[in-house]
Amino acid sequence: MQELGAEIARDYAGREPVLVGSLKACLVFVADLSRAVPIFHSLDFVELAGYGSALMGGHQQIRMLKDLDLDIRDRDVLIVEDVVDTGLTLNYLVRTLELRGPASVAAVTLLDRPYRRLVDDLPVRYVGFVVPDELYVGYGFDLEERYRELPELRLLHLS
């Protein structure tokens, strides 16, 4: 966490980025990351919901359940994700926020699965860990709203 915070602080030195947490699973990560970024920054949240499955040959539709409270025009925006997988949700969020005239938009993710990408040009600038395609719970990650409270990430093996 300290390494990510230091890298972000170095890249945004002299600026005051807006960290935008994508709820709900990122909540613990964005809180820890915010404390690890030793420069002035703002913090705001969005919540998105995805329906359908692009992986099954269908179309995924994404809708915003909670929008930003802050004005991001001319601000550097750093989207904070729990995991970037296909990239469809992050792509939707990036494109939506870009319409509001920010100075820049980039992303940081705790877990990354680049081998599952369906979108190639995502601005994922900071990655905690590249992980295999397994189910993680705890540290804000859930399975049907359970296990978020666990203090660390754990692999969940379904039988």
Which sequence ranges carry the predicted segments?
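PRPP-associated nucleotide enzymes
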Residues: 1-159
